[in-house]
Amino acid sequence: MNIKKNLMKIDIQNVCKKNIFFPKKKYFFLWLKNIFKNKKIEITIRIVDMLEMKFLNKKYKKKNSLTNVLSFQSPDSIKIKHRFLNYIGDIILCAPYINKEANILKKKKIELWAHMTIHSTLHLLHYSHKDSKSKKNMQKTEIYIMKKLGYNNPYN
């Protein structure tokens, strides 16, 4: 399912069972719009089950475990400072894992989905949390975007 609004093109691929919760396409557009504003971008968001996520994590990150989200930058992705940019990368979100995590953390599912989408998108833009300075900068940006969207600080 492709969503194209103004300058953003979002390809959402859902390979999960029908009875599993994941946000409607309008939410992904809203979240990404708050990051990219009027930039021309294309992004793929793939909603997967635990089996596929574990496979992808092992194959590409060399970790034999589950995770909530993976980000894969486009080979020619650059930090967005220019007015236009095309394909920036792929985000893989594990629906059962995120939903379970929301229950454990006593957070609203939609809010955790927003945070995971924002967090992984920032990775596509070269944000990281490898050291304390970059982690602080990334978290500050995540908190700012989440609050702008009317959500709570995801780190509280």
Swiss-Prot record:
Where it mainly occurs, coarsely classed, is cytoplasm
SUPFAM superfamilies (UniProt xref): Metalloproteases ('zincins'), catalytic domain
**What does the similarity note say?**
Belongs to the endoribonuclease YbeY family.
Q: Which GO terms describe its biological process?
A: rRNA processing
Cofactor note from UniProt?
A: Binds 1 zinc ion.
Q: Is Flavoprotein there in the keyword field? A: no
Q: What is the protein name given in its UniProt record?
A: Endoribonuclease YbeY
Q: Which organism is it from?
A: Buchnera aphidicola subsp. Cinara cedri (strain Cc)
- What keywords appear on the UniProt entry? Cytoplasm, Endonuclease, Hydrolase, Metal-binding, Nuclease, Ribosome biogenesis, rRNA processing, Zinc
Membrane-spanning residues: none
> What's the source species' lineage?
Bacteria, Pseudomonadati, Pseudomonadota, Gammaproteobacteria, Enterobacterales
Q: What is its EC number?
A: 3.1.-.-
The role this protein plays is:
Single strand-specific metallo-endoribonuclease involved in late-stage 70S ribosome quality control and in maturation of the 3' terminus of the 16S rRNA.
**Cofactors (names):** Zn(2+)
Highest rank taxon of the organism: Bacteria
| This protein's GO CC annotations | cytoplasm
Q: Where is this chain's protein located in or outside the cell?
A: Cytoplasm
Residues given in the record as Zn(2+) binding sites: 119, 123, 129
What are the recorded GO MF terms, alphabetically? metalloendopeptidase activity; RNA endonuclease activity; zinc ion binding
